[in-house]
Amino acid sequence: SRLEIGRDKFVDACWDWTHEYGGIIVEQIKRMGCSVDFDNERFTMDEDYAQAVRKVFCDWYHDGLIYRGKRIVNWCPNCTTAISDDEAEYKDEKGHLWHLRYPLTEPVNGQDYIVVATTRPETMLGDTGVAVSPKDPEKAAFVGKTVKLPIVDREIPIFEDWHVDANFGSGFVKVTPAHDPNDYAMGQAHDLPQINIFDEHAVVVEGYGEFTGMNRDECREAVIKWFEEHDLLDHVEELDHSVMHCYRCDSALEPWLSEQWFVAVDKLKGPALDAVNSGKVTFHPARWTQTYTTWMENLKDWCISRQLWWGHRIPVFYCEDCGWEDALTEDTDVCPKCGGHHVHQDENVLDTWFSSQ
C-alpha cells in the first residue's frame, strides 16, 4: 500500500506509471478521432504548469480568496480523503427510519419523553440538540425545554429551525452538527457544540465506553441494541433513501467535520451574478437565466484540499518554532520570521479541478 512505501516512493511510482502509459493514452485519444493539436500537449503536472497553479494559489491566498477552516465535508473513510459534491455518487438504498425515545428533563403536557426519527442512530452519540419546525404548533410547548441524551447522559436543548420538515418522521429531529451538513448549519445558527464521534476511518473515538473502537456499522447495531434493552426504541420503519458513495472505491461517504482548505466562493460569485443581472451577459434561450442564477446563489465554498499524495501539493509552509504560516511560490526550509529550521509544507494536495481551471 502507499502507506507502507511512503510518500516519496509512491509519487515516484506514479511518475513511472505516467511515463509508461501516458503515450498509450494519447494514442487511444488519436484512435477515437479527436481533432486536437497533438504537438502542443500539456500534462497537469508539467513543471511550468505546476508553477502557474502554485502562483494562482498564492495570489488567492494572499487576497483572502483561499482559507483553511473546519467545516463539514464529504469524507471517504476508506480512501481517507475529502471529495467534492460532484465526485459523490448517489445510490438508492433500502434503509430504516429508527424512532428513538429521548427522556425529557422535565415532563411536558404529561409526556416524559420525545421521539426523534433518524436514519443514522449511530451518530446520536454526538447529538447536541433536537430541532422542531416553527410550522408545527403541536411541538411549541417543547421549545426551550431539554432532554437527557441516552447513553452519554448529555443535556441538550429543543429549539425551532426552518430546516425541519414537520411532516417527516416524528417531527423531532436529532441535531449532530459534526456529522450532517444541515445539522452543521443549525448548529452554527443556534451556537451548538460540534462533537466529532468518528476518526478518519469512521471508527468511534475514545470516550464512548463500549462503543469506542467500533466502526460505524458496528456502532449502529450496538446503539439500536442498547435502545432496545433500555425500552427506548419506539418503533422502526422501512425507508427508501439515497446514500452518497465514493466514486473511487464505492464506500458510503461520511459527512465529517474536518479542517480543510476552501475557495471563498461567496466572494467570487458576486461579479458573475452581477454580469447576468445587469444584462452584460445573456442566456439563450432566456429560461436558462433563472437556472444559472439559482445555481450560483446556492453555491457553497469549495473544498479544494485532498488527503492524497499524487497531485499539486498545497504550497503553504509552517514554522513549528514561532507559528509563522504563508503561501510561497518557492519551497523553503528556513523560517523568514524567526530563522528557525523546523519548517514543513502542508501535507494536502489540491483538487484536480483547481489546477484545471
Could you say what each language-model-derived stretch is?
Residues 314-332:
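Cys/His-rich Zn2+-binding cysteine-cluster or related metal-binding knuckle/ribbon modules and their
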Residues 154-159, 348-357:
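Active-site-adjacent "gating/activation" loops or surface patches in catalytic cores
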Residues 117-121, 333:
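Acidic, glycine-rich two-metal-ion catalytic cores of nucleic acid-processing enzymes
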Residues 84, 254, 327, 341-344:
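Short functional micro-motifs and their immediate structural scaffolds
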Residues 121-201, 228:
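Catalytic alpha/beta core of large soluble enzyme barrels
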Residues 109-114, 153-155, 325:
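Short, mixed charged/polar active-site loops
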Residues 332-338:
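Cysteine-rich micro-motifs
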Residues 1-113, 168, 172-320, 356:
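Residue patterns forming the tRNA-binding/recognition surfaces of aminoacyl-tRNA synthetases
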